[in-house]
Amino acid sequence: MKKKRILIASIIFILITCIVTAVFIIKNKNRSTSNTVYTYSNVNPDYNYSEDNVLYLDGSGILHLIDTVSGKDIVYCDKPNCTHEGYSRTNQNPSCPAAFYGLSGAVIYNDHLYFIGNMSDEDMTIQYLYVMDSNGENRKKTAKLENVQHVKAVLYRDNYVIGAYSNSVELNDEGQIINDDKPEAGIFVIDLDNYKVYMSDKITSEQANITDIYYENGAVYYSTVRFGDDVTELMIEEGATADAESFAYDNMLNGIYQYDIADEKTTCLTEIDHINNLRLLDGDGYYSSKDGYFVFDTESRQTRQLPIDADGKTQYGPLKKSGDFLYYALSEENSDEVTYYRLKDDKSEELMKLSTEKAFGIENICGQSVYVNYTD
């Protein structure tokens, strides 16, 4: 059985056109770790990427750090003689400072380690912001997030903690499930100066979810996906049985919202139907449809078509952006090759071709480090 893997590699970005097919870890002499910025993973929310390292939780909830210079994968624990045992029914209070319990990853920010989750198993609808020393010791609960069941992605920017969440069930005051089909999603913001919590308006309806978040100048931009209000769970089940892809294309709504933190105001900038793979890249919405590739500018609220020739081709992996460049890959019908491109100023440049056996998707671009996923 083929398995999808994330290749943890650091590649000097100017060489992407010729060497990203191999596993290289190259040292950047000008690297600095004093202002490390982490970006969450769209594939695994417990992975957080930076130019210098990757933080992730393993299957036991133990925090690891992968250094992109040495390639070493180490447990994030400096406690002598620690066995690094994670949370379990028989070990509900692990002593290892690298042990976490939750769906989002831990991140180093402002010389502290931060984590959002519920490690006391008190209430499935409550999450906490844990703040601790940079080595994971001296943990304390600070902000409390109520009616937040599943944390999807978290960013730490400008002394804010910004996260996306989704809920699936409704509970009564005794913690009993009274409705097992109440999908809703939204974003939260925690001000690290005073731990005040801000909550956006929620989106509702079947399979409501947040797919991307982005922060800039006191505002949070986020992309959403949901079925229309007239689509029922039964219709989704029947549509999935007949042709899931076509049903989703015809009935799924994709939105882009803005949440102004100071004004505590949620604004729907656009909601689009009959599209594929909406991605929020540097705050703008990139997507494809049967008519081609498009970008929605969140500042002007205008949509324009991108000069990407995809006739008879299938997109391979997600779109990614770094600076002024948009990276994408296409495979032609009845072909065993994937072609990689980058687009700037409406001009596409072919970078390379790879066989489908060696092809990869770009997982994240952080400065001069490129992380890719592949199948083996």
Label the predicted regions.
Residues M1-L15, F24:
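N-terminal Sec-pathway targeting helices
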Residues V20-T36:
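Sec-dependent signal peptide cleavage junction
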Residues T33-Y40, I74-C77, N81-P97, N138-K144, ...:
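A short beta-strand motif characteristic of beta-propeller blades
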Residues Y38-S50, E85-V107, N147-D158, S205-N217, ...:
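Repeated scaffold domains used in trafficking and secretory/extracellular systems
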Residues Y56-D58, Y114-G117, I162-Y165, Y221-T224, ...:
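Residue position within the beta-strands of beta-propeller blades
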Residues I62-H64, Y128-Y130, G186-F188, G255-Y257, ...:
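A short loop-to-beta-strand structural motif that recurs across blades of beta-propeller domains
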Residues D67-G71, D133-E137, D191-Y195, D260-E264, ...:
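Short loop/turn segments that connect beta-strands within beta-propeller blades
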Residues N118-D123, Y165-K182, V225-N251:
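Short, conserved, GDST-rich strand-edge loop motifs in beta-rich repeat architectures
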